[in-house]
């Protein structure tokens, strides 16, 4: 992989994964810096569980969502354990349980660039390695599990 000038790959012992470091500015980041002229974009799938505190507490599955944020997080963490243990896939769970309309695509959001998603969602997605599953991520929409796919 070609990196812009002054960028190198280092390994984090704490997180046991590679990251990118700029030897001039001392900036470090999980996502690869892009060469000039390239757009920085990722592809991800997600599973969204909304609560009554969500900015739009309704979905294709439920007209009026009444669960609390705590209940939404419990549902999502149960799904997270099923995915991490290999019992389920994010795609299958998203298809059946996600409160996002992307459920009909197994949670696939397609490619997106910085500035197109809510900031916490964007930051979490760009910090993931391809194939890596996030921990629960809160946005105004609800709580998400995110799988970076490209």
Curated annotation (Swiss-Prot):
Any GO BP annotation: negative regulation of transcription by RNA polymerase II
One function term, GO molecular function aspect: peptidyl-prolyl cis-trans isomerase activity
Subcellular location: Nucleus
A GO cellular component entry from the record: nucleus
Nucleus listed as a keyword: yes
Main location per the UniProt record: nucleus
Domain (WW) ranges: 1-35
Keyword terms: Isomerase, Nucleus, Rotamase
Catalytic activity: [protein]-peptidylproline (omega=180) = [protein]-peptidylproline (omega=0)
Main enzyme class: isomerase
UniProt-listed InterPro entries: PPIase_dom_sf, PPIase_Pin1, PPIase_PpiC, WW_dom, WW_dom_sf
The enzyme's E.C. designation: 5.2.1.8
UniProt cross-references to PROSITE patterns, sorted A to Z: PPIC_PPIASE_2 (PS50198), WW_DOMAIN_2 (PS50020)
Residue span(s) of domain PpiC: 39-150
Family note: Belongs to the PpiC/parvulin rotamase family.
Its job: PPIases accelerate the folding of proteins. It catalyzes the cis-trans isomerization of proline imidic peptide bonds in oligopeptides. Catalyzes pSer/Thr-Pro cis/trans isomerizations.
PANTHER family found in the cross-reference section: PEPTIDYL-PROLYL CIS-TRANS ISOMERASE (PTHR10657), PEPTIDYL-PROLYL CIS-TRANS ISOMERASE-RELATED (PTHR10657:SF4)
Listed name of the protein: Peptidyl-prolyl cis-trans isomerase pin1
Taxonomic lineage: Eukaryota, Fungi, Fungi incertae sedis, Mucoromycota, Mucoromycotina
